Regions:
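Extracellular/periplasmic solute-recognition and catalytic clefts
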Residues: 134-137, 141, 153-154, 221-231, ...
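Gly/Pro-rich hinge or "lid" segments in bacterial periplasmic/extracellular proteins
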Residues: 78-84, 182-246, 251, 261-262, ...
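Detector for C-terminal structural segments
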Residues: 40, 67-68, 225-227, 232, ...
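Surface-exposed binding/hinge segments that line
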Residues: 145-197, 548, 556
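Ligand-site clamp/hinge motif
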Residues: 111, 206-208, 236-289, 428, ...
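Alpha-helical secondary-structure segments
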Residues: 37, 123-130, 159-165, 216-217, ...
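Aromatic- and charge-enriched surface segment that lines or borders ligand/interaction sites
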Residues: 95-140, 157, 163-165, 263-268, ...
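N-terminal lobe/hinge region of extracytoplasmic solute-binding protein
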Residues: 39-101, 132, 213
Length: 582
């Protein structure tokens, strides 16, 4: 394996020239100690090879790999959830914004001197074009459903002033959609490239024309089935106007998605600089084998940081038998979360009773509903109560100990991503012990199965709230529900009109308003009583940070941002990294 790794690195970064199918001509040599290498984090779209190598449209619901658009298109703001010393908001393309008195409109001020990679100015016209384009193409594009729900119209007052009229009061509109944090943040497109295109089919890729046109400090050099390569560009607007220095990382190479064992071997061999977050035994094996690798917490547990993505057992809530909240509650009683953590993660983690991350700002809300968690017994492991519910619903156990009704067993096939390979076997074993004929599967089309609802059960994180609970609760709003077989932007397919109305009010209520606490409690009373998904564990990012070639990684003591390279804050890490070797 080491031989294979070494030959791969030599092929990619030591030759004088290399070429890419679909675009990218002769490239100058960049030494390994100025090159950053990682694999694609998206199994469905880049396992074996990049399926989107000839496309760069981040709005396609079919999936677009995060191998560029998450740092090539810069936001109005960044948000750092881990810096406890500041206000956490980092102005970027915007210099400020102001709401009207009832939060039904917001005016955004754009920084002068921002440019696209083709030299055209980045203006308010680009922002309003992107917003209106998404609103007008709902629900066919990513982010479009929310824009349709919230935006009446967006206009450019002048090149540096945008005004957005909202359909209702929304004091967190800019933070929710145009402040990059974790996976949140809508990429803003250049109007002069997109305005005469159909965004539902436009590839945004033609390297002969200089596409994609981006605003960030890198230009696409190669995009082929085998790799995606970005090179730093010296004409980045932020360097020209003195806003930021050029990144020291001169070249980024993304390789196709790898199984975790290959990631481990590549990191140990210094053939990669980071990877997708790893399972506890694997991150420890890297730390033990390679003294040049560290983590967010150095060599100390938990070897990572708490992420915003608490994991639930989800269902297609439109389809039987899991469209019945009582059946879902029976499943809840069959799950031993402490055992999940103890066996699946070797004790290196925490269970979760809510779909919300255990961040300090969120705890100011969740601490106040502990009585509801107790009332609905979320986290209670009680197979007898599970059995009582199923018996009452007409199920009885067959000769093999599985629940059966009308000649059919209660089965559950849980679709998973590779990152759940440690938890899923434990979960399935628990469900089997409770009489549910359970299994799990990891397939190349997992994401599609979840999005279309053909996955009747699945493990999935809740990527939403970081400051207040609204953004997670809105993931369960019925406006995202699509029929089984139709691609849905959110997968839960649960509908409750009373819940919708409360969440709509939450969206119109300022996080500073005490009423938000009351609305949160009302919404969670409904959510916990119906349990559209079953909370399992808080999620941790145990990300290896290879310091052989790069230093000044984000850490618990230097928390300038989190270190996930697939997140929409990755640009800040690229700007923070320093060469370890002269």
């Amino acid at each position: 394996m080491r031989k294979w790794v070494s030959s791969t690195v030599a092929l990619l970064v030591s030759v004088l020239t290399f070429y890419g199918c679909g675009g990218g001509g002769q490239q100058s040599a960049v030494p390994r100690n100025r090159t950053f290498i990682a694999d694609c984090s998206n199994q469905q779209d880049c396992s074996g090879q990049f399926k989107d190598y000839a496309s760069f449209n981040p709005f396609l619901l079919t999936g677009t790999t995060k191998t560029g658009w998450n740092f090539a298109y810069e936001p109005l703001y960044f948000y750092n959830a881990y810096d406890e010393g500041g206000d956490n908001i980092i102005p970027w393309i915007a210099t400020g914004h102001e709401y009207n008195s009832d939060y039904t409109a917001v005016t955004v001020s754009i920084r002068e001197g921002v440019e696209w990679s083709d030299g055209q100015p980045w203006t308010a016209h680009d922002l309003v074009f992107t917003i209106n384009m998404l609103r007008d193409h709902a629900p066919s594009l990513s982010f479009s459903t929310d824009m349709q729900a919230w935006v009446k119209n967006a206009t450019a007052v002048d090149d540096y002033t945008a005004q957005i009229e909202l359909t209702a009061s929304n004091p967190r509109f800019i933070f929710s959609y145009f402040t990059n944090n974790f996976d949140n943040g809508i990429p803003i497109m250049p109007k002069h490239i997109w305005e005469d295109k159909d965004p539902e089919s436009f590839s945004n890729f033609d390297m002969a024309q200089g596409w994609p046109v981006v605003s960030g400090p890198y230009k696409m050099a190669i995009s082929s089935p085998e790799q995606r390569v970005w090179d730093v560009r010296s004409d980045w607007w932020a360097a020209k106007i003195g806003f930021r220095e050029l990144p020291k990382v001169e070249r980024l190479i993304y390789l196709p998605y790898m199984e975790e064992s290959k990631r481990v071997q590549n990191i140990i061999a210094n053939a990669m600089d980071t990877s997708l977050d790893l399972r506890p035994p694997n991150i420890k094996s890297i730390i033990d084998a390679n003294p040049g690798v560290s983590t967010w917490t150095g060599k100390d547990l938990p070897l990572g940081y708490l992420d915003w993505w608490p994991v639930c057992l989800g269902f297609n809530n439109l389809e039987p038998p899991f469209n019945d909240p009582e059946v879902r509650r029976a499943v809840n009683y069959a799950i031993n979360r402490e055992q999940l953590v103890k066996i699946g993660w070797q004790g290196a983690g925490t269970s979760s009773h809510l779909p919300l991350p255990n961040f300090p700002p969120i705890r100011t809300y969740t601490d106040g509903i502990q009585d509801l968690i107790d009332k609905y017994e979320i986290g209670v492991y009680d197979p007898a109560k599970s059995a009582e519910i199923l018996q009452r619903k007409g199920w009885s156990k067959d000769g093999d100990g599985f629940w059966n009704k009308d000649g059919e067993r209660l089965t559950m096939v849980v679709d998973i991503f590779g990152i759940f390979n440690d938890l899923a076997p434990v979960l399935v074993a628990q469900l089997k012990q409770a009489g549910i004929e359970a299994s799990f599967r990891l397939t190349s089309d997992t994401f599609t199965r979840m999005a279309q609802g053909t996955a009747r059960a699945y493990m999935m994180g809740n990527g939403g709230s970081v400051r207040d609970p609204y953004f997670t609760l809105r993931l369960y709003h019925s406006r995202f529900v699509q029929p089984t077989g139709t691609h849905a932007e959110r997968f839960w397919r649960w509908s409750n009109p009373e819940y919708d109305a409360i969440v709509d009010k939450m969206g119109q209520t300022s996080p500073d308003d005490p009423e938000l606490q009351n609305l949160f409690r009302q919404a969670m009373e409904i959510w916990l009583s119906e349990l559209p998904s079953i909370p399992l564990v808080q999620w941790y990012h145990r990300i290896p940070q290879n310091e052989t070639y790069w230093k000044n990684w984000p850490t618990a003591d230097n928390a300038y941002i989190n270190s996930a390279y697939w997140h929409n804050t990755w640009l800040l890490v690229l700007l923070g990294l320093e060469p370890s070797q002269s």
